[in-house]
Amino acid sequence: MGIKRYVANKDATITNAFKLDLSTRATGSNMGEADVTEIFSIYAQATTSSIEKSRALYEFPITDITTDRTSGDIPASGSVDFYLKLYNAKHGLSLPRQATYVIQPISQDWDEGEGLDMESYLDSGSCSWKMRNLENSWTTAGGSFLDRNTNTGIVFDKTL
C-alpha cells in the first residue's frame, strides 16, 4: 500500500512567554494565522526562576482518517504507522542540541484564530494560553490534553 498524506485542518501557537516589557505574560495572545508554529521553552527570561513555554496546536482530519480506514483505503488499527513531519523554518536563533517533545491529543475543541504577531504578542482572540476560543477557557491553562497514562501520547527526544 502506498503513502497516504493527511494535512492539518488548522494550527496555532500559544504561549505564556513574557511580552517585551518582561512584566506582562502573553497568555492572551493568538498566533493562528502565522505562517509557522513555534515550539520553545525559555528559562529565566524575566527572573532567575521563570519558565516560559509555547505550544504548537494541530488539528488533523480525524473524520477523513476514520472514513479511509472503514473503506479500506488505509489498514486497520494496529497495522499502520502514522508519522508527524515538522520542519525547522530558517531563522537566526540557535537550535538546542537535544530536546524532548511531548505530543498529546487535545481534549477540547479550539478555534485557530487570526493572530500573526510572534514577536510582541499583540494579537489576541480565539485560542491562547488561557482560552480555547473567544468564549471558553481551557480546563487547564496552556491547553487541555488527554492523560498520557491512559491515552495515546508520544514522548520523543531529538538529538542533533
Where are these regions (language model features)?
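Secreted, disulfide-rich extracellular signaling modules
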Residues: 1-160
